[in-house]
C-alpha cells in the first residue's frame, strides 16, 4: 500500500531521469498521504513539487492539507483567481520561496525553481485535456517536463487511463504500484 508507493516514488525521484510512477492501488486520503510524504523528501532535498488536481477537487480542504504540512511554502493556482492574486502567486513561485505548487491544469506551467516532482491526481479526469488551442494532454506534457528537468512524475488514479496502463506495460521508465 502506502509504504510501497512512497518507496517507488522515492526511487523514481532519486533517479533524476523523468521516471513515471502510476499509483492506482491507494484510494482516498491514503493517496494524498502518499503524495505528502513523497513531497516531504523532495522539499528536504531542496527541490520543488507541482501537484495538479482536477479543478473540482481544488477545495479549501485540499489546500489546507498541503498548508498543514508545508506551511508558507505552498502556492495555489486555479482559474477562479483574480489577475492580481494570480500574479502574486506567480511571483511567489518565481522567487523560489514556494516549494509546493498546488493547482489545476495550468499550474503545470508555473515558473518553478528546481522541479523535482510532478503529481497528477486523478490522472484519468477529462479536465486534464485542453481542447481549445493550444491543445494538449496534461499527462503527456508533464512526462516531457519531468524528463527535461530530471524530475519524477506521479500519476494517481483509482481508475487509470488506458494510455497510462499501456505505457506501464510497454515503457521501462513507467511503473505501477
Question: Which stretches of residues belong to each language-model region?
Answer:
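Post-DEXD/H (motif II) to motif III coupling segment of the RecA-like Helicase ATP-binding lobe
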Residues: 117, 124-177
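Walker A (P-loop) phosphate-binding loop of P-loop NTPases
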Residues: 28
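Motif I (Walker A/P-loop) of helicase-class P-loop NTPases
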Residues: 31-40, 142
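N-terminal pre-P-loop "Q-motif" helix
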Residues: 1-19, 33
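Conserved SF1/SF2 helicase motif Ia
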Residues: 17-20, 38-62
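Conserved RecA-like ASCE ATPase "motif II neighborhood" in helicase/translocase motors
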Residues: 101-117
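Conserved motor-coupling elements within RecA-like helicase/translocase cores
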Residues: 65-73, 77-101, 115
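Walker B catalytic acidic pair
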Residues: 25, 104-105, 121-123
Amino acid at each position: 500500500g502506502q509504504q510501497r508507493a512512497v518507496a517507488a516514488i522515492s526511487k523514481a525521484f532519486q533517479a533524476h531521469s523523468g521516471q513515471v510512477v502510476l499509483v492506482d492501488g491507494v484510494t482516498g486520503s491514503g493517496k494524498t498521504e502518499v503524495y505528502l510524504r513523497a513531497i516531504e523528501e523532495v522539499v528536504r532535498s531542496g527541490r520543488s513539487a507541482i501537484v495538479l488536481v482536477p479543478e473540482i477537487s481544488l477545495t479549501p480542504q485540499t489546500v489546507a492539507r498541503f498548508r498543514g504540512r508545508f506551511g508558507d511554502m505552498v502556492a495555489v493556482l486555479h482559474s477562479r483567481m483574480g489577475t492580481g492574486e494570480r500574479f502574486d502567486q506567480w511571483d511567489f513561485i518565481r522567487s523560489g520561496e514556494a516549494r509546493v505548487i498546488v493547482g489545476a491544469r495550468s499550474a503545470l506551467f508555473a515558473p518553478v525553481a528546481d522541479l523535482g516532482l510532478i503529481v497528477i491526481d486523478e490522472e484519468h479526469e477529462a479536465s486534464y485535456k485542453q481542447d481549445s488551442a493550444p491543445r494538449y494532454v496534461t499527462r503527456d506534457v508533464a512526462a516531457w517536463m519531468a524528463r527535461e528537468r530530471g524530475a519524477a512524475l506521479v500519476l494517481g488514479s483509482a481508475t487509470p487511463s488506458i494510455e497510462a496502463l499501456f505505457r506501464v506495460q510497454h515503457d521501462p521508465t513507467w511503473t505501477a504500484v
